[in-house]
């Protein structure tokens, strides 16, 4: 029978470094979530990965998870408890879990840790993320052509490179097809807070936005747009992190789907067979870690076709969303004509902390 618990009672713990797990000894895999599993977005999709691990491995694994864990000291406490209770592999699924993950991993050298969206590693800590900015390019391409008000609203979470990259990518591709487009950005300073997210969406709609993009985790912006449409407005959205298909065909006209399941299965298998090692993974459409949800018929056929061409080009590696010429917001050159951005280094997108030319807001400091 498949074994799964929220937090099991204390159990004996045996180190597994460099050795495969015995066939009759289930591997205990833990997941730490920043939101509830029912958030409909970020955490929901990570939990789908957990369920895929269970389905793939059956009785060979036991999974545990804790949801709605704040970033900071609480996260460190939860990770410590998981390790003490026998977890062999722990996935920590929010950027703000980075330092807690490193701290706890140092205390449990025989436990493997996998941290999502961060950049630090250790002998027993890997990190992984997805190239969400690829999906943002598609969203900008669609929104820029469909907007009637020329105002696109963006609900941002925290001013970290991952979020700034997404804003820049969406803006560049909206501007490419619509030189008159304007982005209005609201920083929510939260990953998951439906009330704040709804308030941000409503504010943007009041400011004239007829497209709402989000880098927050709940479906509240979708519901806010739906309510606005019922009141006579025309507002469109994109599902974030998960398909959010319940809001299709409108306001949700497509989505970015984070597909973590293959990665979770692969890393779990590596621990089982003794081949786990520290890696940094940053995958995108090419591997299927980033997927684009169905583009609905609310999108005109010619726009849908051009968006699908962009998806195919990014997936094949024929197009990079950050291809020059691109200037920084202050007008200084960043990428020359035809030059594609590096991942790392002083000019790389991994540490992106600036807006591109044309965005009028300021990056919060």
PLM segments and residue spans:
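A residue-level marker of the well-folded mature domains of exported/periplasmic proteins
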Residues: 23-365
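N-terminal export leaders
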Residues: 2-7
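Sec/Tat signal peptide C-region and signal peptidase I cleavage site
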Residues: 17-22
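Bacterial N-terminal signal peptides
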Residues: 8-15
